[in-house]
Amino acid sequence: MSSFAQTSLMATLNHEGTISTFYGVNALRQAHAAAVSGDVITLSSGTFLSTDITKAVTIRGAGMDVSKAYDIVSEPTVLGGNFNIKIPAEDTGRLTLEGIFHNGNIWFSEGQVKNALFLKSRFKDISQSGSCKVQDLTVLNCRISESINVEDGNSAQFLNSVVKTFYYGNMSFSHCVILDSDRVSNGGNEYKNCIIIDERGSVCFSSSSSAYNNLFISNNTNLLQYVPNNTNLRVPTSDERFAYLKGYNDSKDYKLTDQNRDVLKATDGGEIGIYGGSLPYSAIPTNPQITKFNVASKTTADGKLSVDIEVKSGE
């Protein structure tokens, strides 16, 4: 019997039901090069070299985080290196990124990205840096450790996500934790059921934005002077009940405690923050995971190569 090599880095490409397989750190690059818009690329755990995304494909990893609650895989899917998103305007497909960890820069640089979905992933910095049109980006169950900027005239919605800070664009936030509220003074945004931290105490909420059932942690007593409803609550930054929420760290879960969960209710009567609403935060990807992929070190006598694959379902 042949001995088996260690588990390999692997990417599978699904094109209309036909599966192609690629191996090693360049597997994502090779799969993307072979893909067409609408195809699905699934990555195993491990670190892959990133690639500029020029097609509206789905890229699914094994997860952005591994915790004791998530024992399906042993490590996340990491994309190494900065990359651009430059999908031609005539490509009407939907770009989806799920279950990945990225600690570099992502730029919307060319073409058009419409109705893209970033799901259950951890990003560092996402920005628009060129002529790219970003329309109706959805960020769901994600973490952004530094910032996101889609620029004026572009749009994004954030659902049950942790965002350190954001800059320009028409944005809506529901059940989010915003750790640096410097840009809540931007007009035209919407905030519902969020926890919003203002440690500087220097911002004032825009009269052209809307806010419902948000907890603001701020020393600025005039923060909400232009908000016509009384559904929001402001507490000072010295309030020890919420001190643990300040600052970004990948190890933080940003959960409300029994002590502060009932300080303010969401619009549906439930919990504010990322664990409330109909899409509570979870780092576990929705797609099945490749948990084992072993390849024999040599072929059999008849020239065949033994492969051992194990797949488990995600959420």
What spans do the regions from the language model cover?
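Acidic Gly/Asp/Thr-rich repetitive segments characteristic of extracellular carbohydrate-active
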Residues: 12-49
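Acidic glycine-/aspartate-rich tracts in secreted/extracellular proteins
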Residues: 46-47, 63-67, 216-222, 259-261, ...
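C-terminal accessory segments
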Residues: 230-285
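Short, compositionally biased P/S/T/A/G/V-rich stretches that sit at domain boundaries
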Residues: 270-305, 312
